[in-house]
């Protein structure tokens, strides 16, 4: 995930401070064990992490001012082409971290945290910073699929929704509303979670509702 080019390292210690004081992973040690002595690093010393402690959050990458530490996947950025920055909310959990998507040729090529925004103040976990490959994955579903005779076929949204509604109605009629349950996701908004519980209670007639954040 992280490319290291120590020929660019100026031993400023920002990566060490990010790791020890922001992420509190202590994966990159101070050369003499104390921050105030980091400017006295021995010749040839570079911030090599303890991989057993590293959580690959990328804080060191975002803090590095020279490019000695870089996001490997961001190395595809063409410096001769414009780079658009789009602010959005990370969808991996319910914290709501604010992120910048760096977009080039209609593809996300890098993700950074928004420094002046709560709740994360620019900080991200490994998923939020590096887990964006799914956006352009060839395996990503783009149309509804219906399983027939052991295989899936493409269907229209109207056909798929009609089938789902019909099957839910059949289950409710045969077994009652309490035979069904809803498990909602931290990757959707509060409003969508609210609508899901409303569907469960008002449509299915069940109070069997849970959320992945509790698991």
Ranges and model annotations:
Residues 1-215:
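N-terminal export/assembly segments and adjacent metallocofactor-ligating motifs
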């Amino acid at each position: 995930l992280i490319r290291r080019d120590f020929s660019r390292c100026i031993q400023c210690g920002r990566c060490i401070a990010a790791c020890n004081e922001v992420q509190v992973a202590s994966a990159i040690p101070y050369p003499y064990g104390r921050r105030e002595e980091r400017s006295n690093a021995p010749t040839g010393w570079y911030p090599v992490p303890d991989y057993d402690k590293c959580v690959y959050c990328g804080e060191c990458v975002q803090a590095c001012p020279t490019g000695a530490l870089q996001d490997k996947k961001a190395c595809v950025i063409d410096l001769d082409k414009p780079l658009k920055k789009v602010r959005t909310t990370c969808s991996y959990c319910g914290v709501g971290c604010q992120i910048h998507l760096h977009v080039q040729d209609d593809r996300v090529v890098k993700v950074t945290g928004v420094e002046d925004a709560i709740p994360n103040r620019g900080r991200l976990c490994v998923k939020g910073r590096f887990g964006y490959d799914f956006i352009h994955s060839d395996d990503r579903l783009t149309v509804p699929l219906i399983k027939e005779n052991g295989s899936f076929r493409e269907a229209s949204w109207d056909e798929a929704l009609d089938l789902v509604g019909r099957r839910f109605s059949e289950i409710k009629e045969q077994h009652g509303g309490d035979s069904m349950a809803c498990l909602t996701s931290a990757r959707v908004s509060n409003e969508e979670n609210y609508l899901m519980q409303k569907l469960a209670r008002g449509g299915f007639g069940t109070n069997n509702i849970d959320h992945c954040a509790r698991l």
